[in-house]
Amino acid sequence: MAMEKDLSPNSPRIRKLRDTSYPTTPTSRMNTNNQRDNHYPNIPNSPRDYNYTPSSPTARIRHRRRSSENLAEVNRSNVSRVSNLLLGDKNKYRSMWIRTCSSLWMLGGVVFIIYMGHLYIWAMVVVIQIFMAKELFFLRRRAHEERRLPGFWLLNWHFFFTAMLFVYGRIIQQQLVNTVSSDRFIYKLVSGLIKYQMVICYFLYIAGLIWFILTLKNKMYKYQFGQYAWTHMILIVVFTQSSFTVANIFEGIFWFLLPAALIAMNDVAAYFFGFYFGKTPLIKLSPKKTWEGFIGASVATIISAFIFANVLGQFQWLTCPRKDLSTGWLHCDPGPLFRPEYYPFPSWITPFSPWKGISTLPVQWHAFSLGLFASIMAPFGGFFASGFKRAFKIKDFGDSIPGHGGFTDRMDCQMVMAVFAYIYIQSFIVNRDYSVEMILDQISRSLGHEEQKMLYEKLGDILQHKLQGRF
């Protein structure tokens, strides 16, 4: 079998061909090249063609890509790009549909619970808090280390329910006393529990601390102390803030429903304004948030606050505070905040307006303040949660709510709003008054027999002087 010709750059044939002089004129050079190609069909035309492979039965022939092939590849690339865009839009609208359906289900459930009354709303808040704690406890839990610490996860819930007993015992103290005042035995029992509630909660916490110390294991200290700190962070940042919602509920369902509705309105408006008009990123922590969504949602929230307050203020059972733990419908004097007042327009406006003034509820001006906070400051609770999730490299805190993530994902702004609403109500709206049952409970628990007798005589003198018109 004949050996293939050596056509490497340093072969004798190639060196001889390189040293051969050719005519310099274009025509002569072309003819000479043609003669050379005919005589040496397998010799490269120039030094840059030395990678050329001689023709043989097993050699691979390399062709220059034709323009038609380039055009076909460009067309395929464009079709692929358009398909990806269409698929992205399809997924985008599918996500919006799932989010809308789950929002409607949640809205229907919340409306039904609100219709049931104060205690059912409180129960709903407690359930949400439990789910939020479960989602956050799970973030720091490691299965392989939990197997070495059987029952250690129960310690988290021990601290959680101890905090719940302490916080809610302080919040519903007055309502609890008013509920049991008719039964003497239960009244004494409840009064004793209220009096020593802080002591009971403190020793429950100490019991949990001792339990934690007794479960410490070698080579597990870092994980266990991390869990201990994580649990307390959840109790302070999450549970305590959300518990202000319960205090607002007993001041009247109105003060629970209005702040929650404003946050929901802000969230929905930001989503739709960002979906259709969003172009300018707002903050790096949350890339999907845009300035267009933020501004549009702010305007929509402030306008909605004025409207929601007027609509909700028409229902007496929403505005009455709950003084006990009963479940019946309430009837009360709504107070001046919920009585319409007429505000005349300035004289320079009346020539240009068909109306001489406007009739609104005074509470609508307070709602304006709540709407302003909900539109500007409350979203930063969501930004805080976004940074928190980035730190743990997770998309959502959970998957309990389709299209929304977990309960914590929905409640991040609500917690910030609940604290502000409580502070605003206590500072500018509620005039703190005590019921007869609450005052009698304080007297019976704080004063001795002789002091109670002196108080009785003093009250008798005051009443007698009032009747005689001298006091």
Swiss-Prot record:
Name this polypeptide is given: Phosphatidate cytidylyltransferase 3
Biased composition (Polar residues): 21-35
Function of the protein: May be involved in the synthesis of minor phospholipids and in modulation of IP3-mediated signal transduction.
An annotated GO cellular component: membrane
Subcellular location: Membrane
Keyword Repeat carried by entry: no
Gene Ontology MF terms: phosphatidate cytidylyltransferase activity
Pathway membership, UniProt: Phospholipid metabolism; CDP-diacylglycerol biosynthesis; CDP-diacylglycerol from sn-glycerol 3-phosphate: step 3/3
One annotated GO biological process: CDP-diacylglycerol biosynthetic process
Residues passing through the membrane, by range: 97-116, 120-139, 149-169, 196-216, 228-250, 255-277, 293-313, 368-388
Record keywords: Lipid biosynthesis, Lipid metabolism, Magnesium, Membrane, Nucleotidyltransferase, Phospholipid biosynthesis, Phospholipid metabolism, Transferase, Transmembrane, Transmembrane helix
Family per record: Belongs to the CDS family.
Annotated region described as Disordered, given as residue ranges: 1-72
Catalytic activity: a 1,2-diacyl-sn-glycero-3-phosphate + CTP + H(+) = a CDP-1,2-diacyl-sn-glycerol + diphosphate
